[in-house]
Amino acid sequence: MTGQRIITDAHYPLSELTSRIIACSIEVHKTLGPGFEEVFYQRALHRELCAADLDAVREVEIEVRYKDLALGKKRVDFVVEDCLVEIKAKAHIDDVDVVQTISYPKASGYPMRLLINFGGPKIEIKRLANTRTSKPNPREGA
């Protein structure tokens, strides 16, 4: 992440953290460009996040619950400190991607989610806030 300026906005929860994640993502997109499969962007982003001294865990399973019933588990691409990060590599983010990113981690308790699409000529990023506050430790498993 060379020369990226971190811009924060107090209107967004975890603005500094998400700005750092976004700066790492921009570096990956600038270097690789569009056209690769998601896994390549995940690997490159993980390297950038670690180089930026962010605690990033890849391929985290979170538990999906209905009230007190555990329904199963769903994998998210990253947990970066207090933020869930979903990666896409397609022409554009569509409504289904946004709904999916909002819905299945809703019960996770992470205050912020980022949806990042590397597939187009310009990187697309959506910040999605979660109002729940308690979250599991991704290193302990769900």
Kindly give the residue locations of the regions a language model identified.
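Solvent-exposed, charged helical/coil patches
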Residues: 1-55, 112, 123, 129-142
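Amphipathic alpha-helical interface surfaces
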Residues: 17, 41, 45, 80, ...
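Nucleic-acid endonuclease domains
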Residues: 36, 51-53, 73, 98, ...
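A short acidic/basic microdomain associated with nuclease active sites
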Residues: 52-68
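Well-ordered beta-strand positions
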Residues: 57, 77-79, 117
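Short beta-strand or tight-loop elements
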Residues: 60-62, 74-76, 121
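Active-site beta-strand-loop-beta-strand hairpin of nuclease catalytic cores
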Residues: 72-86
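Nucleic-acid nuclease catalytic cores
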Residues: 84, 88-136, 140-142
